Amino acid sequence: MTRTSDKAPTQRQLRVGEEIRHALAEVFERGTVRDPAVAGVALTVTEVRISPDLRNATVFLVRLGGGPLDEVLTGLRKARAFLRREVAIRIHTKFVPDLRFESDPSFDYAEYINGLLHRPEVARDLGVPPSGEDDGDDEADDEDDDGGEEGPGAAAPPPADEGR
């Protein structure tokens, strides 16, 4: 009987993953990793996915400011034992999972989608002026600018005289 990876993570997996994420973020913030490929590089731990048995963890990273992450990942893989010890000091679990480091593709994908949404063809289809073009009007909506206020804070019109 094997578990499938389709299942959503349990609360325990999520909690332990967050603890590991915070612990690694603290280690990276302090700059205690001495590998030259990692030293001085600002990293963000975006997510930690942990296996159901809590023995393996995949750590997803992004380099702040962009740039290639290949050399940094190689350095982190070399420093895996050191990082595992640092995590063990900071979290209190029976076992500390084996750490695997990967680049987080979600930010690149979000940038790709954002680029698609800002293409002139898409803006035309949506009826939105393409970015960078301005109609020269700073008012959001000035079609009936009669000085009257509308909305929740506006005064109600006077009641009509009925029967007088």
UniProtKB/Swiss-Prot annotation:
It is found in: Cytoplasm. Keywords: Cytoplasm, Ribosome biogenesis. GO terms for molecular function: ribosomal small subunit binding. GO terms for biological process: maturation of SSU-rRNA. This is Ribosome-binding factor A. Monomer. Binds 30S ribosomal subunits, but not 50S ribosomal subunits or 70S ribosomes. One of several proteins that assist in the late maturation steps of the functional core of the 30S ribosomal subunit. Associates with free 30S ribosomal subunits (but not with 30S subunits that are part of 70S ribosomes or polysomes). Required for efficient processing of 16S rRNA. May interact with the 5'-terminal helix region of 16S rRNA. Residues 132-149 have a biased composition (Acidic residues). One of its GO terms (cellular component) is cytosol. Belongs to the RbfA family. Residues 123-164 are annotated as: Disordered. The keyword Cell division does not apply. It holds the Pfam family RBFA. Its main location: cytoplasm. NCBIfam families: PRK00521.2-5, rbfA. Residues 155-164 have a biased composition (Pro residues). InterPro entries: KH_dom-like_a/b, RbfA, RbfA_dom_sf. PANTHER family: RIBOSOME-BINDING FACTOR A, CHLOROPLASTIC-RELATED (PTHR33515:SF1).
